[in-house]
Amino acid sequence: MTDSSHENVPSRARRRFPGISSRAYEHPADRSALVALRRLTGFDTVFKALSGLLPERSLRLLFLSDSVRVSEAQFAHLNDMLRDACYILDLEKVPPMYVKQDPQSNAMCIGLDEPIIVVTTGLVELLDEEEMRAVVGHEVGHALSGHSVYRTILLFLTNLAVKVAWIPLGNVAIMAIVTALREWFRKSELSADRAGLLVGQDIQASMRGLMKIAGGNHLHEMNVDAFLAQADEYEKGGDLRDSVLKIMNVLPRTHPFTTVRAAELKKWSETRDFQRIMDGHYPRRDEDKDASVSDSFRESASHYADTVRTSKDPLMKLVGDIAGGAGDLGGKLRDKFTGGGGAAKGGAGPTATDGGGTPGGTAGPEGAAGSEGTEGPEEGPRKA
């Protein structure tokens, strides 16, 4: 987007990111969950069928007729924020935004051909200017990442699942895809939270917005550190029963829990990756075609391995212990059958040392490099 196409620029000095690729802020779990979704049996068939059947024109006409379109004449302050967000993230076409009457605090980016951003009156009335700016940036991040297509399909399939629930086994296949879509969408929220921070460039505003979405407009009664401590307590969880309950609680949700989002975003804001973006060093869109899919897979795998290794959740700890135990057992079996242990005793020192030492020596640095910068927080309001 050229500077001349914007009469409005950010109200205070904010960094702009010309040509930024969504890869710069996408959470590794977002990418890997989308890969898993695309590999799900039947997803491609459903996706292609729905792409031609979904009444997108009807959807646009519905918002046009029953919501307020943001413009210079209506909700001008939101219009300024929207144009600012597109300017900062260099989104060439400003998507239409609508304000819908709804007391629930919510925002979404939907649409198959072109994204549409919708925010509710409940959200507009709840947040101050800088908090709302993070939300608008969050939704523009969804648009830049192309999330609106899958979000639209998720909404449609969720409604369809209710209508066909009476058909034997008719609901099973649909719910399998819906569950996978929800898992991906929860991860995509972490990416969009990061985009919101890049637009607002105010971590405190992002934290305040998330706290308000969780606890309402009583900011004087809330504390960021205490709120983040809740996320830590939630992750630690208690015992394995609590871990299972956490999984069951999150399955029907399209968004991660608010405290988790706040903790993820705060963590990312303190990483070297975030600072590099702010310094102008980030992946660019014109490089996307050259980006290695295998590198993306490795980064995602590294992220999950690091998550299991560092998680305080009892179930994750058990998984890590089992994986670590299996690794130790594998090493012992390898030495047993290759004579690695005996060779060390018998004097074939160089061979044994090279064979056993090299993997051990390279695994550590590789793991550290892989995990660096991939663990990420997130942030921007719950339903945003």
Residue ranges and their predicted role:
Residues 82, 119, 138, 192, ...:
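Divalent metal-coordination and catalytic microenvironments
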Residues 212-253, 264-294:
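Extracytoplasmic and endomembrane cell-envelope/extracellular-matrix remodeling and assembly machinery
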Residues 73-79, 85, 89-91, 169-237, ...:
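Short helix/loop segments within enzyme catalytic domains
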